[in-house]
């Protein structure tokens, strides 16, 4: 079985994670105590991708929860599915990282990391044939960003051949929680570029917009946002957990989605997104789902795919549908909007079909796109970073934890390199191949 070990770090990561496990348990018919109450054998067939079966038929999530302060953990434990998790898998410190990346990565986090790695090893050993890890975290904080990236690099050393995928909440342009977000995010990207295989970029502003515009929620809470993220995360792994006509797993996704190793930041979309009131007035058809999931309004990241070009994308369908229709729709999209796809990667749209839809729906799709437009997000963060770093504002918090200014400069230039790489491939055309090689030789 292809198991996935789930890790959640920091406040944001733990809250997304808690919601994710609610959705996951619901899909597999597991109640908050870990007992199975499902109605179909399909729910049990590959339940051990995410769950471990304990004595007495209890299903326990393969989840590791870490934080540098006990607060969020306590609320997860007190939440509806708090009793589901294995108590030993809660690893937390007492001090907190205080939104300081250096504390999470170098001081406080480094003290706690060994106990987290012990739990990771335990979970990995209980797997039959582990496929990889998934981490939910934010990039703007201290624990999720600093300690999360530290954990990724440690796991990378120990399990170099396993897929590492992250669901990273990027600081959004309008909704800011802390002043030092640009610092934390830039330092995190510096790590993720090197050590992760695929990063699903999410941000709160785009999620707010979806809740507000599409779902017609007047006052969206973090719970609503996290529910959207959870739906998308479940969609990216459904083919591992349920039978399908065209399967897709984390590694297949990575191979098909990442044309150049550094460019592994994806935008995620989900369909159908309709407000609760208008659900019954719309027919869910494959064309409608396809059209919706390519729509810029459905992207969970505040970058507009129309401003860039898709290097690759994958559409993961769920539900009973004809594969012929899916293929037709995919062709249709590529032919109609061919200018949005780079022409030097033929067949760069991958579709997969999983037969079991999410709870309460007949069909759904998750969209994962590797578009050059994601550079907008990094550009924005880099600009904010530069403005503060030029004045060395707030820098003493980081140097006080033993960081060097040089590290900031490196992270900044790595971020700028990433942006210009995206731009280079956005401008590249199929017949320019020769010119590129010459440039590289001269350089």
UniProtKB/Swiss-Prot annotation:
Tubulin is the major constituent of microtubules, a cylinder consisting of laterally associated linear protofilaments composed of alpha- and beta-tubulin heterodimers. Microtubules grow by the addition of GTP-tubulin dimers to the microtubule end, where a stabilizing cap forms. Below the cap, tubulin dimers are in GDP-bound state, owing to GTPase activity of alpha-tubulin. Dimer of alpha and beta chains. A typical microtubule is a hollow water-filled tube with an outer diameter of 25 nm and an inner diameter of 15 nM. Alpha-beta heterodimers associate head-to-tail to form protofilaments running lengthwise along the microtubule wall with the beta-tubulin subunit facing the microtubule plus end conferring a structural polarity. Microtubules usually have 13 protofilaments but different protofilament numbers can be found in some organisms and specialized cells. One of its GO terms (molecular function) is structural constituent of cytoskeleton. CDD domains: beta_tubulin. This is Tubulin beta chain. The keyword GTP-binding applies. Keywords: Cytoplasm, Cytoskeleton, GTP-binding, Magnesium, Metal-binding, Microtubule, Nucleotide-binding. GO terms for cellular component: cytoplasm; microtubule. It comes from Thalassiosira weissflogii. PANTHER family: TUBULIN (PTHR11588). One of its GO terms (biological process) is microtubule-based process. Belongs to the tubulin family.
């Amino acid at each position: 079985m292809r198991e996935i070990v789930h890790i959640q770090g920091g406040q944001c990561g733990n809250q997304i994670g808690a919601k994710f496990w609610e959705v996951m348990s619901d899909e597999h018919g597991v109640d908050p105590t870990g007992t199975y109450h499902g109605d179909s054998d399909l729910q049990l067939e590959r339940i051990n991708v995410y769950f471990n079966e304990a004595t007495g038929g209890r299903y326990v999530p393969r989840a590791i929860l870490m934080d540098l302060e006990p607060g969020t953990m306590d609320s997860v434990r007190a939440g509806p599915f708090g009793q589901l998790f294995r108590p030993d898998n809660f690893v937390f410190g007492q001090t907190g990282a205080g939104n300081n990346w250096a504390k999470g990565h170098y001081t406080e986090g480094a003290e706690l990391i060994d106990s987290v790695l012990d739990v990771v090893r335990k979970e990995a050993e209980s797997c039959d044939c582990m496929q990889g890890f998934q981490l939910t975290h934010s990039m703007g904080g201290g624990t999720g960003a600093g300690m999360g990236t530290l954990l990724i690099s440690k796991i990378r050393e120990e399990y170099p051949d396993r897929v590492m995928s992250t669901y990273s909440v990027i600081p959004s342009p309008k909704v800011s929680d802390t002043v030092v977000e640009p610092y934390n995010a830039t330092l995190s990207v510096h790590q993720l570029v090197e050590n992760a295989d695929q990063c699903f970029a999410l941000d709160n502003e785009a999620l707010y917009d979806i809740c507000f515009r599409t779902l017609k929620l007047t006052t969206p809470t973090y719970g609503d946002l996290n529910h959207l993220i959870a739906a998308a995360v479940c969609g990216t792994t459904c083919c591992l957990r349920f039978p399908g006509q065209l399967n897709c797993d984390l590694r297949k996704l990575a191979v098909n989605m990442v044309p150049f190793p550094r460019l592994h930041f994806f935008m995620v979309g989900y369909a159908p997104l309709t407000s609760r009131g208008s659900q019954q007035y719309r027919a869910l058809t494959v064309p409608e789902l396809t059209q919706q999931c390519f729509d810029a309004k459905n992207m969970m990241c505040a970058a507009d795919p129309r401003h860039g070009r898709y290097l690759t994308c994958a559409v993961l369908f769920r539900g009973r549908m004809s594969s012929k229709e899916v293929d037709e729709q995919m062709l249709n999209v590529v032919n109609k909007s061919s200018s949005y796809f780079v022409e030097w990667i033929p067949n760069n749209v991958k579709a997969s079909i999983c037969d079991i839809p999410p709870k309460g729906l007949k069909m759904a799709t998750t969209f994962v796109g590797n578009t050059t437009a994601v550079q907008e997000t990094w550009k924005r963060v880099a600009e904010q970073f530069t403005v503060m770093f030029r004045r060395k504002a707030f820098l003493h918090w980081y140097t006080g934890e033993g960081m060097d200014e040089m590290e900031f400069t490196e992270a900044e230039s790595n971020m700028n390199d990433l942006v210009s790489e995206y731009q280079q491939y956005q401008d590249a055309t199929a017949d320019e191949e020769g010119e590129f090689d010459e440039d590289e030789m001269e350089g």
